[in-house]
Amino acid sequence: MFANSAFVDGRDTGYQSMRSDVWKDTDDDRTGMLAWVFEDDFGFEKYCDYVMDVPMYFVYRNGTYVDVSGESWHDFMEGKLPQLPGDTPTIDDWEQHLTTVFPEVRLKRYMEMRGADGGSFEAIMALPALWVGLLYSSKSLDAAEKLTSDWTQAERDALRNDVTKDGLSTKFRDGTANDIAKEMVRLAADGLKERGLGEEVYLKYLQTVVERGSSNAARMSELNASEWKDDLSKVYEYATFPDVLPTF
C-alpha cells in the first residue's frame, strides 16, 4: 500500500519498493522476518535474547563512538570487550544496541513498524492511522489475527519477498495482496470509528489505493512509461509537498 521507491539511479527498477527489496540482502544477523515471533512462547525475554546475540557495532563513551564491530554483547556484560576491558553495559548502552537491529518490526519502548516507504503527506498521515486502527481495538486486532493465524512461515516469507516487486498484485493463495490490504484498511477503519475521534478520515489515501489496486510506485511507473519518457525530474514535480498542506 505504501510502496513508493521504484526508481534508482535515474531508471525504473521494475520494483515497487526497491527500498524494501534492499533490506532482503542486508546483514542477516540483524534484519528480516523473525520466524520465532509467531511462536506461542514469544515474549520480551526471547526478543532480548535475540538482540543480545546480534554482533555489536559500537559503544558510546565520553562523547566518542568506540568501534566494537563484531564483538559479543555477552562478553560486554562480563567486562570482556577488548576495546573496553573491565567496562560493563549501562541501560543507555542497551538502548543504543537496540538501534542496531533492523527486523521488519523493531521492539523498543514501542513497536516500530518499519515496512512502509516514505510518501505523500496523505500517506504519512495514513500510516499511523492504519496501525492505531488495527492495534488499539481488540475487535480489529482479533480479526486481524484470525485473518493471518493459519499463514505458514513459507507463505509469510514469500509474501514479504514478492510484494517488493509486484506490490498489491502479488498472488497469495486464491487471491492477491490487495485482498489482504482491503481487509486491513476495513478493520483499521472499524477500529478508528470505535475510538470515536473521527480519525478514520486519515485512511482515505489507503482506501483509494486499495480500490485502485495499485500503489503510488505503480502509478509513477505508469506515468513514466506513458508521459514522462524517463524524464525523472517529473518525479520531483509529482511528489513534492504542496505549499499548503491538504486538510482532512
Predicted features and spans:
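Active-site lining segments that contact anionic ligands and/or coordinate catalytic metals
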Residues: 108-110
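Residues that form generic nucleotide/phosphate-binding pockets
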Residues: 50, 97-101, 147, 162, ...
